[in-house]
Amino acid sequence: MKSKIIRAFTISWSMDFVTGMLPDLQKKYEVVLLSSPGPELDDAETQYGVRGVRIPMERQISLFHDVVSLLRLIITFIKERPAMVHSMTPKAGLLCMVAAWLTRVPVRVHTFTGLVFPTATGLKRRILMFTDAITCACATHVIPEGEGVMADLRNYGITKKPMKVLGYGNIKGVDMMHFSRRPEVMELAQKLKKEGMFTFLFVGRVVGDKGINELCKAMEKLSGFAPVRLLLIGPYEDDLDPISQESKEIIENNMAIEYVGGKYGDELLAYYAAADCFVFPSYREGFPNTVMEAGAMGLPSIVTDINGSREIIVEGENGVIIPSRDENALFKAMLEMVRNKKNREYMAGKARGMIASRFEQNFVQKCLLDFYDEILKKHV
């Protein structure tokens, strides 16, 4: 009889991190996916034959809804009797680890893909640190996505438990066959290129924490120095972390900035292939997948000196690292990327190989499967 594993996420969108490895997981374990209702959970059930459990969870602090979600999780874990609950994302981590501890689930794993509290202030920061500490206390195993996240958990006193980074970090890995300059991708990319125009690309949520305010100001200044354009790909999240009104006006009025919206599949790859440099001035990350994807597509990157980004990018080898929240440093790095063709081409030439050697998807997934085998043998 196969051991039952429940993989838990706050929202179904986050399941993208695990669906690619479901076939291998299902060979060894009975896998149940748990999240708030959403189309990604529906798709996983249809495509992979996996069973889904739908429990609404709020991403923001909401005491009443959180208590209701916790009670539903307790009932679910009593009914399912899993050998392991493995949670990702902050709210699912807190609620699932508490519920799994209360119901005596033998193996309770939480993966920290990023930490919110280091960039928070005041009471909110104290609350976030407290909830992360509870998550760790209730878990039997704490998995930081990268060395930087692990260092923060230790240095801020969130937990004293032994922690382990799997492989070189990251939870998903990069499908190097998919993220490649295939003929059909390059055909689409050719239509997106503009002759004589240097193209910067950002892929991610268009929110304050991603450094969009600094990026807009840097780009507004840069457009007066060189023929450049910035393509912004990703959704706005005005209800959670809106960009400034000034930035919205810059995006609307500056002809050098083009908001593209959401792009997926080969269409997204075409934008990577049409760009000259990836720029990602985020304030905080766990291990940003888009920086790895850009590298796999042969792009040099400009990133900030934060967790994850500085583990993917090696200064001067496959990109440039600058201080976060510094629009002047961002402007100078972008201008240097435009002007110094020799350095840019050197970094572009190294980018794909440096991703493949550390973050190839099969390797990353094997690290997680080996970890599951190890801990379930010991505890079940």
Label the model's feature ranges:
Residues 53, 133, 137-185:
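Donor nucleotide-sugar binding/catalytic pocket of nucleotide-sugar-dependent glycosyltransferases
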Residues 42-45, 229-256, 260, 343:
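Short, structured helix-loop element that forms part of the nucleotide-activated donor/catalytic region
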Residues 264, 283:
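Aromatic "clamp/platform" in nucleotide-sugar-dependent glycosyltransferases that forms part
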Residues 329, 336, 343-358, 364-370:
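A short, well-ordered alpha-helix in the C-terminal region of glycosyltransferases
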Residues 15-20, 198, 202-221, 328-329:
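A conserved mid-protein helix/loop that constitutes part of the nucleotide-sugar donor-binding site
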